[in-house]
């Protein structure tokens, strides 16, 4: 789960990480009032969306008067902000963050993220913070340093010093930088985050180190014990189909193709999408119904897939382990009738009660195309949507 920058800064503030003063705004008038309350003389008007690259996309502007704040807020609020992370369709800006202007002398990058390979927390830092960190990672990876923190030990003073030295933090700011790293680590652990990123981390002309941005991702599996984090969720920033799917415990992710996929198991779902692409098709979604799918869940899955106007065909690929094939067959038949299915449907089932499931589909009277292998299923659905 992601949150907005201003929400992330509130969390950092709670853990003692220095951040500039700022006030969220939902209207142009609120933006003006926020600027007046902060007092200026320079403000930053920031679009609040769940994507990076806002500055390059025109979503972060400096204002030097209240009139500037009003004009920029009117320009940014409601715009369709396109960044390298939103895709070409962009994301509508519904919230702003009005923040004190900063004395920027040197920008750094700092983040901590779960590293599953080492089963540790990776601290990543760079002397080249700001809007072009992706380009730094691509062109000059030697400017990015990584250390791994054992969660049983925590971030040590020596590791903090290693980070400071690695990014060339001046001596008069090193102690403050290490303190921020330790507080960031505690924040990361205590909030069950999977990513906390500060980009940029600014050092001003007086040697003060301040977080000018905040990006958080939280482990969805831990949200049950973090109601205060769940309360920060902004459904407007999420795909409506994914939000709807989550209500029925369906793992759904929208893609750009035209072949809907309904599969049980994440691994099989990814393999199914790969196979569709191998045979010249493009999947329209990832959809894992899990091991406890009911006919009702299958019906809802069909409804969600078919809300996407790009879907021209559906492939159902089921391995009957925990999930019984006859249960899926019942769900498929029920779903086809409930949605009055008008697009080609290919079903491949293997495993528990396989023959019974196939028999039910064959006797349903519905134009369901059967397949025995993944390759056959992919070939048939790709041909059917041509």
From Swiss-Prot:
Pfam family, one: ATP-grasp_2
Domain ATP-grasp: start-end pairs: 9-244
Amino acids binding substrate: 264, 321-323
Family: Belongs to the succinate/malate CoA ligase beta subunit family.
Record-linked PANTHER family: SUCCINATE--COA LIGASE [GDP-FORMING] SUBUNIT BETA, MITOCHONDRIAL, SUCCINYL-COA SYNTHETASE BETA CHAIN
Gene3D superfamilies, per the entry: ATP-grasp fold, A domain, ATP-grasp fold, B domain, Succinyl-CoA synthetase domains
Catalytic activity as recorded in UniProt: succinate + ATP + CoA = succinyl-CoA + ADP + phosphate; GTP + succinate + CoA = succinyl-CoA + GDP + phosphate
Documented EC number(s): 6.2.1.5
Protein name (Swiss-Prot/TrEMBL): Succinate--CoA ligase [ADP-forming] subunit beta
Originating organism: Delftia acidovorans (strain DSM 14801 / SPH-1)
Complex and partners: Heterotetramer of two alpha and two beta subunits.
